[in-house]
A protein has these predicted regions:
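Short acidic/polar hinge/loop motifs at secondary-structure boundaries
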Residues: 65, 98-123
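Extracytoplasmic beta-strand/coil segments of soluble accessory domains associated
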Residues: 66-99
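N-terminal periplasmic accessory domains that precede
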Residues: 65-68, 106-107, 121, 133-155, ...
Length: 717
């Protein structure tokens, strides 16, 4: 273990020891959620998940679900704003229990933090959930109207990075009926300074190239939503409609300087401008129906979701000019496609005893994509772009998954458990008539189990296990070259196999007076690890191809301590220390043993009744890549929130990376290639947000009459 990691671990353990000694020994551990001196915890726990209270994360103001998750140990955002958790960027995203119309980081950026009540992380999901996702499922629980009458919310934000966002939602609830309509428009920007040095050898020639400039990545969303809910307690019907457009551009503006062999003479300085844009016009409809069969609580549920992208286009553009402004090279790539996918589920819950539930279900998922890929190159003699007909590639892809599962959940005294088994039958078809085809049929089993034991003195222990997979989508399988920039090209792999994961974790949590301590040890075994491998493609040009790089173990420990040193100050310290063992099975990848970790120091201050301040410090240690290493860095965030008009209006101000210390420095090395990259986010990044929430309850709601989701106190209770 490196000295810096020893110091971090020692500091964290020392903090735990001090806080435990300083507290009373009276235990107040709860199974579901814990509050300290009446203040809801930032992170609470259930049998199979941890839950983050978005309202407690001030640094997420004006941000998205991505910013809320920064509070979680083991969460890291890279230089381009993509989220990884426990070393992986593969996870499923749900919104209110339904699969998101987008995936990964894009799905997290689609939901504004002001509209989020909680975020749930399921690292070992039960058998009733889909099996995709290396580190599990992230479920975003949005804010819902809880009383009868009108509920209106409006949220806006702007930042020094030219990020803008505005959303609004109107909800009306009356008796058994609830109607809502809303919309959002956002333009999220990510800017950074970029430098890279590469040494490549290809075809007997060598080159050392230098790049210096700026890179950006934006995410624009324009989505409308509406729905209707009917709930009598015996019958529940929910209809939700969403539609709109998403645009995801990224690119860079660089100066390139190249030295060529044999004497590494200095080449001409070139001016490069590269662009990528993914545009989608999407529509999604979902219908859910639940029928409660008896007073015991047995029920039948039926759900269906349909998503259709009537138009989706991936556009890539590379441009190379000399300093006189004359075009020397260039490409234009177009991948145009139509998507449609559908999910259906039928389940039956049997309460075979007061604490016991048996759930049986079947699910069906189908995803289809049809389109073509075209590219044209700049012809220097004719001074025009020329279509490359030999590279034209039409494609068709369809994946179907037919699933069945059984799961039991029960409680015996202080012991709570669930166990389940899922069967997936997969049908995978891909046809690229001009290149290749892929047809697969197979059936797999995915077990899961969770166990929780609650004691008065020792606290609560939970144990969870699940088997999961990462199945490659078509964008990872497409065997034609696309351009990230003129010196970096990417290609898919039609022979790519699925990655399989076994996840096991053991957690302990206990409250001592004003202090809550949580510790989680986890193990994750991955076979057929999917990752990009970089190799020399041409003189000064690299090619990133996606492969099954090898097998790996990740063993980690997460610790979080939350305490109140003073009535106006809540302190949370958390850390993640993991040991990674990767054994390469693909030529060009490097077997590695490494230790990585993160440390967070989160301070919440109550300056006045309606004024709050938050100051965070985060350290991210160095971590391995399949071909190299990324170095450690540290950053600090500062946020303030002011509440006005009896809680209806909130003003927020957030300064990210306030001391400008976040720097991303990575190295990749293999035969015939070495590269070193430096990325530094643009400074400053200051966000201003405003939120207005108005409720107008009906006369019936004001009188305290019973309704399904009302909250009651005093005599009405």
């Amino acid at each position: 273990m490196k000295p810096i990691h020893k110091k971090l671990l020692s500091s964290l353990l020392f903090l735990i020891a001090i806080t435990l000694q300083a507290q009373e020994r009276k235990d107040t551990t709860l199974m579901r959620e814990i509050s300290i001196n009446g203040q809801r915890q930032r992170i609470s726990y259930r049998l199979d998940r941890q839950q983050i209270d978005a309202s407690q994360v001030l640094t997420a103001q004006g941000g998205t679900a991505l910013d809320v998750l920064r509070a979680v140990p083991g969460v890291v955002l890279d230089a381009e704003g993509s989220l990884s958790y426990r070393g992986s960027q593969s996870f499923l995203v749900y919104v209110d229990g339904k699969i998101s119309p987008l995936t990964g980081t894009e799905a997290l950026q689609m939901i504004g933090a002001a509209n989020i009540r909680d975020i749930e992380i399921l690292t070992t999901p039960s058998a009733k959930y889909k099996t995709d996702g290396d580190v599990g499922i992230i479920n975003i629980v949005t804010r819902r109207a809880e009383t009868e009458g009108w509920d209106v919310s409006v949220n806006g934000m702007a930042s020094t990075w030219a990020t803008l966002s505005l959303d609004a939602k109107i909800n009306y609830r009356m008796g058994h009926h609830n109607i809502y309509v809303g919309g959002q428009g956002s333009d999220i920007h990510n800017k950074s300074q970029f430098q890279q040095e590469k040494f490549t050898t290809a075809g007997g020639a060598s080159a050392r190239s230098f790049a210096d400039g700026t890179r950006f990545r934006n995410f624009r969303t324009y989505i409308g939503q509406g729905g209707y809910e009917f709930n009598t307690g015996w019958h529940r019907l929910a209809i939700d409609l969403q539609g709109g457009r998403t645009i995801n551009p990224r690119g860079g503006d660089m100066l390139y300087e190249t030295e060529l062999n044999p004497n590494l003479s200095l080449g001409e300085v070139m001016d490069s401008h590269d662009r990528y844009k993914l545009t989608k016009y999407l529509f999604q409809a979902s219908v859910d129906y639940t029928w409660k069969l008896n007073e015991r609580g047995d029920e039948i549920s039926l759900s269906n979701r349909l998503r259709y992208d009537r138009f989706s286009e991936e556009y890539t553009e590379s441009n190379m000019f000399n300093l006189a402004g004359e075009r020397m090279e260039g490409t234009r790539g177009y991948e145009t496609e139509h998507h449609w996918d559908c999910d259906g589920a039928l389940s039956y819950k049997l309460h075979y005893r007061p604490q016991g539930i048996l759930e049986l279900g079947s699910q069906y998922t189908t995803y289809s994509e049809e389109g073509d890929y075209r590219i044209c190159y700049w012809n220097l003699p004719t001074q025009q772009f020329v279509w490359q007909d030999d590279l034209y590639a039409p494609f068709y892809y369809r994946r179907q998954v037919i699933s069945g599962y059984a799961q039991v959940n029960d409680r015996i005294g202080p012991l709570q458990f669930d166990a389940g088994l899922r069967v997936d039958h997969l049908i995978d078809d891909m046809d690229l008539p001009t290149i290749t085809s892929r047809h697969k049929r197979y059936t797999e089993l995915y077990p899961s189990a969770h166990l929780a034991y609650n004691t008065t003195k020792a606290g609560t222990f939970t144990l969870g296990y699940s088997r999961r997979t990462n199945r490659p989508g078509i964008w990872k399988l497409e065997p034609y070259i696309t351009y990230e920039d003129y010196h970096t090209r990417i290609i898919g792999n039609p022979d790519l196999e699925s990655e399989y994961i076994h996840s096991l974790e053991l957690s302990w949590r206990k409250t001592f007076g004003n202090t809550q301590v949580t510790a989680t040890a986890y193990v994750r075994r991955r076979t057929g690890v999917v990752d990009y491998v970089r190799r020399a493609y041409d003189v000064g040009v690299t090619l990133d191809s996606i492969v099954n790089a090898g097998n790996g173990w990740r063993k980690g420990l997460e610790v979080q301590v939350t305490t109140k040193p003073a009535p106006w100050w809540q302190l949370t310290a958390n850390g993640d220390l993991s040991f990674h063992n990767f054994r390469a099975t693909y030529e060009g990848c490097i077997s590695q043993h490494s230790t990585t970790g993160t440390v967070g120091w989160i301070n919440n201050f109550r300056l006045a009744k309606n004024t709050a301040l938050q100051f965070d410090g985060h350290f991210v240690s160095g971590h391995h890549l399949t071909q190299g290493w990324e170095k450690a860095y540290v950053y600090f965030d500062l946020a303030a929130r002011q509440t006005l008009l009896q809680g209806k209006l909130q003003l927020g101000l957030v300064a990210h990376d306030v001391f400008h210390t976040a720097r991303y420095h990575s190295l990749r090395t293999q035969t015939f290639l070495s590269s070193e990259t430096w990325v530094r986010p643009t400074y400053p990044n200051i966000v201003f947000s405003i939120s207005y929430h108005f409720r107008q309850p009906t006369a019936k709601a004001k009188s305290g009459a019973l309704s399904n989701e009302a909250e009651f106190v005093g005599k009405d209770f």
